[in-house]
Design a protein with these regions (language model features):
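PLP-dependent class I/II
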Residues: 1-188
């Protein structure tokens, strides 16, 4: 199973590897993709998937009874996004690079926080255990004392207890303010 929803949001002129590059896996491969991230069409519920041939009838039964079909306007918008130029994606990615660099530097400047440079999407996943808090504790304190909403790493796996996830799909001003608020929280 490969979730490739962020396949168009890779930084530094790198390409996201795809399981489609391994023909021997095709009969075991499920790929999920959509318009929500690359074309900023969240909420439109428009996407596509690739399944092994023998699973397609079962998937069709599941989908026809649970989501039926996407409305016509969303389908036409999806076609327009695919047929149109990629200028908007490129502009968005340029902005995300600036925001990524801002949050990366800002997180690493915080006492007890260690963050790797995000390679794609619009999330940073820093380790916060050196602050004296695990990810869940850090998130609660950030919400209540700094007014910053972040997600504990445990939402992404049991081995991520020491981490939190920040989104940098916000303005530079909001990112800077969030970092400043968390810095004040950590240095009280």
């Amino acid at each position: 199973l490969s979730d490739e929803i962020y396949s168009r949001q890779i930084f530094d002129n790198k390409e996201m590897p795809s399981f489609f590059n391994y023909p021997d896996l095709r009969e075991r491969l499920i790929v999920l993709e959509g318009w929500s991230k690359a074309y900023s069409m969240t909420g439109w519920r428009l996407g596509w998937s690739f399944w092994p041939k023998e699973l397609v009838p079962h998937v069709n039964k599941l989908l026809i009874n649970s989501v039926s079909c996407v409305n016509a306007a969303a389908q036409y918008a999806g076609i327009a996004a695919l047929d149109g130029p990629d200028d908007s994606i490129n502009e968005m990615m340029e902005k995300f690079v600036v925001r990524r660099d801002l949050i990366y530097k800002g997180l690493n400047d915080l006492p007890g926080v260690e963050c790797s440079l995000p390679g794609g999407a619009f999330y940073a996943f820093p380790k916060v255990i050196e602050t004296g808090m695990n990810g869940t504790e850090f998130c609660k304190k950030a919400m209540h004392e700094a007014g910053v909403a972040i997600v504990p790493g445990t939402a992404f796996g049991k081995n991520c207890n020491d981490y939190v996830r920040f989104s940098f799909a916000a303005s530079r001003d909001n990112i800077s303010q969030a970092l400043e608020n968390i810095k004040k929280m950590l240095t009280k």
